[in-house]
């Protein structure tokens, strides 16, 4: 009888422990148990988008996981069925690329932000110039190279090349280009002193204290810089549309403006 009582006591204790272990799960909010929103975003968005995502998580209790890279690389990954919920490109071309392949939800697409491209140098550089037709870019480089994102596929590189062609100076520097995989990598070349000059977004320059802006390229020298956003067609995450919509709210837009982006209405 004594042993039976002990066995019953042990069994009851086990049931109670199991029940206690289940209580925290029952009390976890549904938002905390939902899957993170997987975001593919242009590298130039990192500082601002990190702030916006943190704000959204604080307000909703929901999480994001953001992969930053060149828009071209991200679009190709999306085409290859990489798991993602939201895509933010640094130009219209790569958003069009995935849209033409029916990889986004068309009704979710919106133009979010604008930007400028600038010529940057190291913070202690004495380089100075006025960006105008025929300006002396080659002499400013000396024996160094001009850092740019890939000029054939990455938006910042394409914008930069278009501007240099429009200003009539591309032919003088085309053999002095140091191409990087994305605009932040190009910025890093200048920031580290590995290239005397670079062409990056104005927002990138503002994010790095080791560079300074030498000049701003006139907007009429290159296609308009537009950052579109869309939810991917393959996304089954119910929070994806909510996050994409949050990017255009009065709470989020000032965080983009703080980093130097232009808000598109």
Regions found by a protein language model. Give the residues of each.
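Exported/periplasmic ABC-transporter solute-binding proteins
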Residues: 27-83, 89-92, 96-115, 120-265
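Twin-arginine (Tat) signal peptide motif
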Residues: 1-23
